[in-house]
Amino acid sequence: QAGFARMLGRAGLPGSPMIPAERALGSLLALKLFGSARHSHVMGYVFDEGLALWAGLNAIPKRAFLTEYSCRIDPDSYPRLMRAWFDALGRLGLAQGVSFDLDFHTIPFHGEDALVQKHYVSKRSRRQKGMLAFVVQDAGTRVFCYANGGVRKEDQNDEILRFAEYWKRRTGSWPEELVFDSKLTTYANLNRLNQLGIQFLTLRRRTRQMLDAIHRTPLSAWRRIELHGLSRAYRTPRILDEKIQLSDYDGPLRQITILD
């Protein structure tokens, strides 16, 4: 119903008479849904008739084709595909979200390219060469509505503003609420979001100075709340609700500190 083949054609994704673009993308998607972690693992599935049928082929393409496919894609194709996907979901009646989860994800790179920057890989708790991807997910529908797979380290702090501008162009209004980690952007950009009327929820960096201030807070300033409908072990945490000031941010910010 979304017209996936037409969408890929307008975006300019590569294909051939033997393996059109929608079949190539279908093969990659089939492997991902089946649980194959990497393209190099495809050789164990090339004789799986079910995966091939799902992708619309008589056999899943082999490792060499799938590995080089991304290198054949024009970088301008990704924004075109993203816009087409956004429009297609709108025609199908998918409601536009009001709250969005934002995050960076590092895709490890194991080659020798000197131009590839190092980024933090959370699963390995270290920095290594990789491509930094910025993804935005609708908190209500769980649909990914924005992505940029080529973020440079020097530009990553402003990526949140690029998403806000993209959403404004596509919908005519700014996103209502953004949820993200503390390392995603700067205090100055938080101030910019506030000026645009965009609400945000984020985690602060837990510095030594911040922790010392929390421990010096008298017990009378804390209050205990009860969380319902959750499976967490601690359902009655203590919270400290206060107003704070930050550098590069105009006006007060509401900060909620939680202790079990």
Kindly label every feature range from the protein language model:
Residues N191, L196-D260:
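An anionic, glycine-rich sequence signature occurring as long contiguous blocks
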Residues K129-G130, Q195:
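Short, solvent-exposed loop/turn segments at the edges of secondary structure
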Residues L178-Y187, R206-Q209:
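Acidic, metal-coordinating catalytic cores used for nucleic-acid/nucleotide bond scission
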Residues R169-E176, Q195-L196:
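Short, surface-exposed connector motifs at secondary-structure boundaries
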Residues Y45-E49, T186, T207, D260:
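Polar helix-capping/helix-linker motif
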Residues G97-D101, P175-E177, Q199-L201:
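Structural preference for beta-strand elements that scaffold enzyme active sites
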Residues A37-H41, F109-E112, F144-Y146, A188, ...:
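Short helix/loop capping segments that flank catalytic or ligand/cofactor-binding pockets
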